[in-house]
């Protein structure tokens, strides 16, 4: 089971998941994410996935917008939120889902984005948008 220390939930940390992606044949660091259930509200799905994957709830969320990752051939939408004020609950992974959870310092994750250590489009987009908000004092 993934471990999560209370120090991982500090507001200057980014709760990240590391999991093996079969299509790429490698492990990747990513932000928690998941799929919408039938007729599920995207915001409710974000809250559900955060608790399922990371075993936390959040006091507040900041809407970071919508991402269209593959506009040339797919209509997929990714809804992005930043979660603040994390509180531990319990993790509920799907059958066959294996991932590690860690709270990494914000600046370290941003550096991983800028040096291509993180290449997942939703994570890159979310981190850059949130960095911009932080720079403006809104994060």
Where are these regions (language model features)?
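Short, small-residue-biased leader/transition segments that mark boundaries at the very start
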Residues: 1-6
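C-terminal boundary of histidine-terminating zinc-finger modules
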Residues: 127
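A conserved beta-turn-beta hairpin within the catalytic core of GNAT-like acetyltransferases
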Residues: 23-29
């Amino acid at each position: 089971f993934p471990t999560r220390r209370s120090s991982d939930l500090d507001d200057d940390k980014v709760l990240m998941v590391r999991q093996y992606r079969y299509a790429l044949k490698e492990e990747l660091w990513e932000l928690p994410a998941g799929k919408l259930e039938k007729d599920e509200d995207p915001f409710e799905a974000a809250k559900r996935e955060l608790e399922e994957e990371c075993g936390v709830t959040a006091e507040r969320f900041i809407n970071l917008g919508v991402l269209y990752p593959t506009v040339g051939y797919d209509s997929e939408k990714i809804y992005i939120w930043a979660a603040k004020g994390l509180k531990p609950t319990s993790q509920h992974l799907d059958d066959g889902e294996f991932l590690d959870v860690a709270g990494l310092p914000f600046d370290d994750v941003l550096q991983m984005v800028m040096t291509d250590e993180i290449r997942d489009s939703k994570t890159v987009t979310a981190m850059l948008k949130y960095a911009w908000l932080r720079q403006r004092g809104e994060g």
